[in-house]
């Protein structure tokens, strides 16, 4: 796992990946078993797996959640695996630990004055899409920019899930799961980098 993470970080330095201070943050569910078998899934329960909700699929699942910080070009710059019940805002705090000078675009799950102020104190700016009835909503033009840029996340997660089967858990333990997710993200970033070098589509 440490070797994979080292390779991933080296990739971000060696390949022509644009150096950016603008990022998109989001998360996706990582169910470790079918919902009905959750009580028998002891190997993962001992490593923090619990119940969480997936708003996009409108379902409850048992497992973890993968939080990702993604560049506007689509590279996964950082990721964190937490229990499924962990709030997205807490996941973001972990992701940007030790970082500063970032502008982060998020959806409604990242709205919160406490979080925004906490990130601002570290030199980061959080621009999260607010609810339509919010009294402090962003101007229409800004909302359109955030929404447009956030569409990159849908493409990234779609490729991770559809082409790399990132959401399909075959590991029997937490360490194996972490290694597998790290390998998938490394493979994704590598293919994206090769695409930019050869100006061709590299099959994931």
Show where each model-derived region lies.
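Short alpha-helical elements
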Residues: 1-204
């Amino acid at each position: 796992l440490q070797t994979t993470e080292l390779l991933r970080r080296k990739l971000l330095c060696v390949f022509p990946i644009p150096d950016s201070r603008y990022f998109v943050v989001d998360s996706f569910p990582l169910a470790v078993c079918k919902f009905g078998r959750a009580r028998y899934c002891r190997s993962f329960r001992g490593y923090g797996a619990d119940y969480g909700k997936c708003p996009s699929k409108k379902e409850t699942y048992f497992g973890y959640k993968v939080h990702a910080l993604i560049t506007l070009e689509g590279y996964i710059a950082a990721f964190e695996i937490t229990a499924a019940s962990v709030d997205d805002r807490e996941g973001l705090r972990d992701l940007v630990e030790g970082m500063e000078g970032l502008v982060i675009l998020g959806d409604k799950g990242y709205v919160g004055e406490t979080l925004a102020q906490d990130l601002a104190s570290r030199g980061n700016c959080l621009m999260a899409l607010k609810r339509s009835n919010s009294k402090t909503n962003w101007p229409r033009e800004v909302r359109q920019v955030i929404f447009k840029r956030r569409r990159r996340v849908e493409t990234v997660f779609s490729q991770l899930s559809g082409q790399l089967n990132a959401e399909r858990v075959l590991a029997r333990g937490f360490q194996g799961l972490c290694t597998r997710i790290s390998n998938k993200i490394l493979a994704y970033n590598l293919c994206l980098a090769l695409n930019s070098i050869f100006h061709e589509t590299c099959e994931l």
